[in-house]
Amino acid sequence: MSPLVTLDQATFRFSETGTLGPISWQIESGQKWFIAGRNGSGKSVLLGLIEGGGRIQSGQARGIPQNAVVVSAAAHLALIDRERHQYDGADDKFKGSSVADILSELNPVDKVLTELIRRFQLQPLLGQRFRQLSTGETKKVLFVRALAANCPLLILDEPLAGLDDGSREVAMDSLADFVGGKTVLLVLNDWAALPDWIDHVAYLSGGRIDYQGPMDPTAARSWLGQMVVLTNEAQALPAPLPSSVPGLS
């Protein structure tokens, strides 16, 4: 594997008062990372920085791609906001992008897109305007658009949020079938939903990565739960083992 992204003691400023880091982290092509940590630990901020936002204050950040595809609350709102601002006006002939237009924007792999449209039952929506869809429908479209995209890096920040139970199951099955050789960065607050195709974990605490390395998903579900308990109770964490998931008694 070759490095796709390298952070070397990088500290980022993401707001007037907020910083993240220092962080040293290497993401290699094809790796599937699960980003874990308590609420407020910096998971979403870190993914946003990998996407290309924020200003580096110190250290180095190399290889951050310009064509990462993102599923997140922020990406969802940005797409809705784009459609609203682009087409709100007196000229009624501009009614917004169709669902088919939205799905075709990111150079999709046609066979994958066709199958995902079938799985999520989006065919009746293709001719509708994106801005006219329900929240759940827009979430499905954003997910399908991202997974079908021909891109090297897929960033998934709570990708199941806003989906009904049936669509969540379809989404997880589709990820297992179609992530393929893509590099994936995934945040899920539900440890039980951690997919079997994940092969690495990074655990954040206080804006820093405390643990990173290869992992077995089955062992990791228990390990991550114990890490959260230890952090919540302010207990001393075990010594980092960067090359493997540490076993906790």
Language-model segments: which ranges?
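Conserved ABC ATPase "signature" region
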Residues: 108-125
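Conserved H-loop
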Residues: 190-196
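ABC ATPase nucleotide-binding domain signature region
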Residues: 44-107
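Hydrophobic anchor residue at the start of the ABC signature
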Residues: 142-143, 171
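Walker B catalytic motif
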Residues: 129, 158-159
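Conserved beta-strand-loop-alpha-helix hinge in the C-terminal portion
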Residues: 208-231
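ABC-family nucleotide-binding domains
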Residues: 157, 164, 168
